[in-house]
Amino acid sequence: MLYYVQMKWTGSGYVYSICRKDTPASDAVCVYTTNTGFIGDFFILQDRIYFATSVDKDRMISTVDLNGENAYAITACSRDCIGCYYSNGWIYSYSAKDDRLARFRTDGSQYEWVGEAEIKSGWYYISNGNVVYSVSNDGTTTIKCFNTEKKTTDTLKTFDTTSAWINGLYGNHLLYEVYDAKKEGDVVTGGTMRFYLYNLNSGTDYTLGNDKIEGTVWNDQIFLCDKAGNAELRSLQDPMIVTKEFKLPNALLGNISTSARLVLAVGKNLAFATDGEGSQVKIILMYSEWKELTSFTVN
């Protein structure tokens, strides 16, 4: 069973829906639709869906049951919450009003700020009580870690470039990438994208490879691929060894910003964003044998 957000143009605006596919071959079922705003990040916990949404210009976190009924907001519009991520009994969301990352329980209670004000929307990952995030200032990028139990912030890595991004966090393993630019004087003439794996416990860094553009870490594995869809797997137990190489059925989505994630973990599977027809995006879900499980298009 697969849930996803669909955005459909009606001629006067977009209508957002949470849809479900019960089997790879089945038609999509519209579970919940809003005509007043957007639907963004979401997760499913027990018998309810929790999601970021809006009513006109007011943004909030709401919830609805799996039948699309009993919908209600769990944060006030005044919080102006962006993003909806779950970890260890807490929902994490960025409050644009407070300009702070916050967390709260699934009923909206125990609302509290998380870490420093420098943690911005969309630039953090959460695992094992750690919030790992990046900060770019004055030509540098710093990767930091806030521990939600100790309430402490540690600096993990610092780079003399703003072309550094975090890509995923699984357990105590952080995947990040850095663009190593080649210059002649002050002019950039080329460069190489490099992925790295960092162990939060030991501080060990592993260089994983060059010229890959997308990657994620999940299910004790590391996935990397290039623009043409040439992919590889590595194990977290020995990240320097490529355990499998294969070709994706489609090249990754083109003409997209660096901050957009084209590869996402979906349970034990991976989902890839590829080019569809016209302005559509084709989503391909692949299972553990690295064969296509299902695909669908979204606007």
Please provide the spans of the model-predicted regions:
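Repeated scaffold domains used in trafficking and secretory/extracellular systems
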Residues: 1, 36-46, 79-88, 118-129, ...
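Residue position within the beta-strands of beta-propeller blades
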Residues: 3-6, 50-53, 91-95, 132-134, ...
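Short glycine/acidic-enriched loop and turn motifs that connect beta-strands
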Residues: 7-12, 54-58, 97-99, 136-140, ...
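A short loop-to-beta-strand structural motif that recurs across blades of beta-propeller domains
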Residues: 17-19, 60-62, 100-102, 142-144, ...
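Short loop/turn segments that connect beta-strands within beta-propeller blades
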Residues: 22-26, 64-69, 105-109, 146-151, ...
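A short beta-strand motif characteristic of beta-propeller blades
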Residues: 27-33, 69-76, 110-116, 152-158, ...
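Solenoidal tandem-repeat scaffolds enriched in leucines and small polar residues
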Residues: 82-146
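Hydrophilic extracytoplasmic domains
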Residues: 181, 198, 204-209, 213-219, ...
